[in-house]
Amino acid sequence: MKFSTTTLMMILCGQNVARAFAFSSGSRSVAARSGARVLSSAATEEAAEATTAAPLQEIPDMEEIVSLCKRRGIIFPSSEIYNGYAGFFDYGPLGAELKKNLKDVWWNHFVTQREDVVGLDSSIIHNPTTWKSSGHLDGFSDPMVDCKETKLRYRADQLFFSPVILQGDEDKNIIGYVCVQEGNDDEMVKAAKTMSKKLLKEKDLKGNRIEAFSFKELVEATEEEFAQIPSPASGKPTLTQPRDFNLMFETRVGAAVDSENIAYLRPETAQGIFINFKNVLNSSRQKIPFGIAQMGKAFRNEITPRNFIFRSREFEQMEVEYFIPPGDDVWPEYHQKWIDSSKDFLVDKIGLREDLMGWDVHEGDGLAHYARACTDVTFTFPFGTQELMGIAARGNYDLTQHTEGSGKNLGEYYDEETKERYIPHCIEPSLGVDRLMLAVICSAYAEDEVGGEKRNFLKFNPRIAPIKAVVLPLLKNKPALVEVARDLFEKLQARGYNVMYDAAGAVGRRYRRADEVGIPFAITVDFETIEDDAGVTIRDRDSTEQIRLPIDDVIPYLSKKIDGY
């Protein structure tokens, strides 16, 4: 994404502010149903934890996130044994479940619970004229530069340069330049300082202090400046002039190898919706206003994929194109409704931390040429504040383009109420699944102290947690305990919950394993369960508090906690 200098500095400054927020402890009592009783802390071994968690820590750095994801089977680098390509990732057992849950909640919120939105699953490869009409074939590109010495490539709008000026120089003479990749403020300043030290040494000015850096995008450099700006890799002015690089992956359809067989992997899912507008309208008996929702894979040949799954070359999108009548008095109301619905989904349905979210309203030159308005949902990741989701008022650009490109009356709609014919406008809430997953993991990552020991855990909303509960027999060598635990485990599976059975090790150690992968509830079968018919204990992951419930009440209890009913 391209930022103006002003916007960049706001982002960089905002990073430290956002990181200063500490997680609130979030401790909450587990509401007991009729027949439940709160355990004393000394009742059994599994209740020996302190029930009040220490304050949670700030969001971790990316190394911690990446390490956790690989260690616990959330995300792996793709084809790692062959040193696979950058920008491609495989989702492990927990990652696949988390991703599925996010998509299910999104679909339920934006499609199933609405009468005016229907679904679509279009193909990944369209006729290439689709991309000609949409503008992707000619304009879907990023500016790219090469380092002639190291052969490394960069997105020009992700490189920032600053003049180097000695402190105390009243004439503000520029002794050289530094050039660094986009990152958070600490990373950029650190890289610039390293480069400036080499510059001072080369100029025989070692020991001199320099003024604060004033970063600007490389694409804003004058010809005179560009000739002196060093490559981040070589430290010398070895960068090529920026040139456009089309981001679409090219492939071929059929056995022949010629230009007529060239096709492209879709760079977005939206165009599949637009070219099917008439098909869906005629077959679903919908009337304007109505929406078409789709989620699926998209591909962009990013010049420099970075920041883990935030910017990758293969990713998934979830989008709605909501078609409305034209008119400047119409779209603002619908636009705001979709903003409100998106916030409800992100905060209430999946549990993103609201203190790490922001709303960026685009105006004037910040809008795409076809857009009437656009509001981006931003999120403060460990590497900075970035766009998470966009809600755009797109006008009728896409339907008009495909009507003209195909020569068919694709977009015209006859409104029976107003007796008018028009090409509908649309509101587009668009969200990347992979970016959302990263935001969810960053929101959920927590550290506290329980029983005098540090605890790392993922505070997933139970609705999206990959594993909903873990069933624990107190001892694995007691057949009576194991029999009851296995029976409960199988009943929970039959109910449709993804649950885990764990009998290995001390109960406290099993709790820690469950906490680290975000399992909201731990259900322990102990001797009171089998000897006194006293039910099981259910431990809440976040507060570590425990209650005892009759076995027959476990499924209704979990249903209320997970599903809300």
Where are these regions (language model features)?
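N-terminal chloroplast transit peptides
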Residues: 2-46
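NTP/phosphate- and nucleic-acid-binding module
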Residues: 37-565
